[in-house]
A protein has these predicted regions:
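Weak global preference for isoleucine
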Residues: 4, 33, 48, 65, ...
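Short linear motifs at secondary-structure transitions and domain/linker junctions
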Residues: 6-11, 39-42, 70-71, 93, ...
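Active-site-proximal specificity loops/subdomain of glycosyltransferases
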Residues: 2-20, 24, 30-66, 72-77
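Catalytic-site signature of metal-activated, phosphate-bearing donor transferases
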Residues: 53, 76-150
Length: 150
């Protein structure tokens, strides 16, 4: 089973593409979890990690994907993603590229993100690492893109 979780508070006001994102996630996952609807009006970094951890904890999938509400998967990526899940069961995560798009044909690789998490084999993953308190850790150590399949 594959779960995707995301967070948002007031996506209409922020003009987030939330409806499109949720439809995209439903096409990929067996369940979609949304947290953060009760986020405090005053922003704090620790709230991000808490909401991400809530999403991970509520997810029932063997694999769990953390998606920001403005992240999307390309429809042609599904088969490749499912193959990566099958071939990476001994790892706590899979890193995927994050692209920054400027125009339809102009984009660049921005970074690699460890947002696909193996909850079945590593249920103790925490989303409390990094300067923003929301990167994936295992046993207190940051899960880095260089330590997992890409």
């Amino acid at each position: 089973m594959l779960s995707i979780f995301t967070t948002f508070t007031d996506p209409k006001k922020r003009m987030d593409p939330w409806e499109e994102a949720l439809e995209c996630y439903k096409d990929f996952a067996d369940e979609v979890i949304v947290t953060g609807k009760d986020w405090k009006p005053e922003f704090t970094w620790k709230d991000i990690g808490k909401n991400f951890q809530d999403g991970f904890n509520l997810s029932n999938g063997d694999w769990v994907i953390r998606m920001d509400i403005d992240y999307f998967f390309h429809e042609k990526s599904k088969e490749r993603l499912l193959n990566a899940l099958k071939n990476s069961t001994d790892y706590p995560a899979i890193a995927i590229p994050q692209y920054q798009f400027f125009t339809v044909g102009r984009y660049q690789l921005k970074t690699r993100l460890c947002i696909i998490l193996n909850k079945k084999k590593f249920p103790n993953i925490k989303l409390n690492g990094g300067g923003d308190y929301c990167l994936a850790t295992l046993n207190g150590s940051l899960i880095t893109p260089n330590s997992v399949p890409n």
